[in-house]
Amino acid sequence: MLGVLLVLHGSKIPEWKDVGIKYAEYLSRYFNLVEFGFLEFNKPTLSEALSNLLAKGANKIVVVPLLFATGTHFKRDIPRLLGIDGDEKKIQYMGKEIEIIIADPLGFDEKIGEVLVKGVNETYNKNY
């Protein structure tokens, strides 16, 4: 069964968790197993979220970094926290081999650009 693991950076500000909850709820409309985890500061950690997916029966996991670009967190921290070494994209769980695929960061997308335009306009209209 496919599991989707959303990765958020995390912050000392607790509202980060609200973002994770809302994206997980949204994706749950399309996928049965969705969890989110943080790279730092907030809970659940990325490792805890992975464990939750595995406990629910995920045998293939697509990791979706909610990051805009490739950087240290993407290249080093996410694989390390998931227990992936080098090019190997599999982990062992209860005697089973679990495939983990890490999606690319969000990058540029016109739909995200539209959300930014909307935010600018709403902010401007509230203040003027």
Swiss-Prot record:
Gene name, Swiss-Prot/TrEMBL: cbiX
Binding site for substrate: 43, 68-73
Catalytic activity: Co-sirohydrochlorin + 2 H(+) = sirohydrochlorin + Co(2+)
Pathway the protein contributes to: Cofactor biosynthesis; adenosylcobalamin biosynthesis; cob(II)yrinate a,c-diamide from sirohydrochlorin (anaerobic route): step 1/10
GO aspect biological process, one term: anaerobic cobalamin biosynthetic process
Assembly with partners or alone: Homotetramer; dimer of dimers.
Role summary: Catalyzes the insertion of Co(2+) into sirohydrochlorin as part of the anaerobic pathway to cobalamin biosynthesis.
Enzyme class: lyase
Enzyme Commission identifier(s): 4.99.1.3
Keywords: Cobalamin biosynthesis, Cobalt, Lyase, Metal-binding
Binding site for Co(2+): 9, 73
Pfam families (alphabetical): CbiX
Similarity field: Belongs to the CbiX family. CbiXS subfamily.
Active site per database record: 9 (proton acceptor)
Key word rRNA processing present: no
Protein name: Sirohydrochlorin cobaltochelatase
Annotated source species: Saccharolobus islandicus (strain Y.G.57.14 / Yellowstone #1)
